[in-house]
Design a protein with these regions (language model features):
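Short, glycine/charged-enriched secondary-structure capping and boundary segments
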Residues: 22, 84-87, 116-119, 218-222, ...
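Amphipathic alpha-helical transducer elements in NTP-driven molecular machines
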Residues: 35, 49-52, 65-71, 85-99, ...
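C-terminal-of-GTPase-core extension/linker across diverse P-loop GTPases
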Residues: 2-8, 13, 19, 147-354, ...
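Residue-level signal for pocket-adjacent positions within structured domains
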Residues: 25-33, 40-42, 47-50, 54, ...
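Short capping/connector residues at structural and topological boundaries
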Residues: 6, 35, 40-43, 50-52, ...
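Conserved Switch II/interswitch segment of TRAFAC-class P-loop GTPases
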Residues: 43-48, 75-85, 96-157, 172-185, ...
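Conserved G1/Walker A P-loop phosphate-binding module
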Residues: 1-114, 142-143, 148
């Protein structure tokens, strides 16, 4: 399940520095000038999962395979991007191809790092980005209305549904609100996603702070947190510069460095988990002598759907899922203990998988 999160923001806010740290490479050219990221950089990132290590230790498993999520570093946006200013058209197309958006805002003062607007104001940065995305959505939708109306009048049900959703989105956008604020019925969600609206994607606000503010945040990041709450977005505080330094250290040095900063873990771990949560994802595990593995599914997925993530044959020929809750598996030290304690369950097709379930699937094709 290769889901993508776009890392977006104005030039010189720390997007590429953050991306470099996420991928532990210098693939994104982090430079102090606009548009240093011209082609989108895609990084395949492991989702931090302490539970997986504990499960692997019980068996023990030879290999540990975490869940993964993709981050995309795209070119810095400038005012007028919706009209093609800067690298606007390319920027917008790159976002359209992702599942969620992480808005990176600059929450630090540094005279050596220029700001494209001439001053540091994270809320103004958010307004600029959101406005450009809303304008792009408005233009995209308005172009479709006349054709959809014509086709809907012929009795085309699909066009009628799309037209209804287009008008729903236009109502929000014309009121100055992103499309994600619209209330979409469950039966319309697939058609809604097909609109590929930039402002309908789940949003994560990332406050990029200086080293001194990495543990507690600062006045600017507090303002961003308040805006995130108002906008229904998630929020995380991180110091991209610190994270880039941490990424180059070995595990022992990393722990010591974090302690000196008053941190218990890298900020990137929080960012990755927030992105995972933002996409409505959860994890189940398969465990054996060969490997312990985390699998990514959507919240609410049934056992057959979870099996299908491993292989489509597992879903097509699903018979049952042998299931143990994570806490029971660890507390009872594996499958044998869970069986003895009556915590080993046989679940059928209607079972909704819970986060952390340890599963084995029986199927026939």
């Amino acid at each position: 399940m290769a889901l993508k999160v776009a890392i977006v923001g104005l030039p010189n806010v720390g997007k590429s520095t953050l991306f470099n740290a996420l991928t532990q490479t210098a693939a994104a050219q982090a430079a102090n000038f606009p548009f240093c990221t011209i082609e989108p950089n895609v990084g395949d990132v492991a989702v931090p999962e302490p539970r997986l290590d504990k499960l692997a230790a019980i068996i023990p498993s030879k290999e540990i395979i975490p869940a993964r999520i993709n981050f995309v570093d795209v070119a810095g946006l400038v005012r007028g991007a919706s009209k093609g200013e800067g690298l606007g058209n390319q920027f917008l197309a790159n976002i359209r191809d992702t599942d969620a958006v992480a808005f990176v805002t600059r929450c630090f003062i540094d005279d050596d790092v220029t700001h494209v607007e001439g001053k540091v104001d994270p809320l103004a940065d958010l307004e600029t980005i959101e406005t450009e995305l809303m304008l792009a959505d408005l233009e995209s939708l308005e172009k479709r209305v006349a054709n959809l109306e014509k086709r809907a009048k012929t009795g085309d049900k699909e066009s009628a549904q799309t037209l209804r959703l287009v008008n729903l989105a236009l109502t929000e956008l014309n009121a100055g609100r992103p499309a994600r604020k619209a209330k979409v019925a469950a039966e319309d969600e697939k058609a809604w996603r097909m609109l590929q609206l930039l402002t309908s994607k789940p949003a994560l606000y990332v406050s990029n702070v200086d080293e001194a503010s990495a543990a507690t945040g600062n006045e600017m990041s507090n303002l961003v947190a308040q805006r995130a709450k108002r906008d229904g977005a998630d929020h995380v505080v991180i110091s991209a510069q610190i994270e880039s330094e941490i990424a180059m250290l070995d595990p022992a040095e990393r722990t010591e460095f974090l302690e000196t900063l008053g941190l218990t873990e890298p900020g990137l771990n929080k960012l990755i988990r927030e992105a995972y949560h933002l996409l409505g994802l959860q994890t189940y595990f398969t465990v054996g002598p060969k490997e312990a593995r985390a699998w990514t599914i959507h919240k609410g997925d049934t056992a057959p759907q979870a099996a299908g993530v491993i292989h489509t044959d597992f879903e097509k020929g699903f018979i049952r899922a042998e299931t143990i809750a994570y806490d029971d598996y660890v507390r009872l030290k594996g499958e044998a203990g869970a069986r003895e304690a009556g915590k080993f369950r046989q679940e059928g097709k209607e079972y909704v998988v819970q986060d952390g379930d340890v599963m084995n699937f029986r199927f026939n094709v």
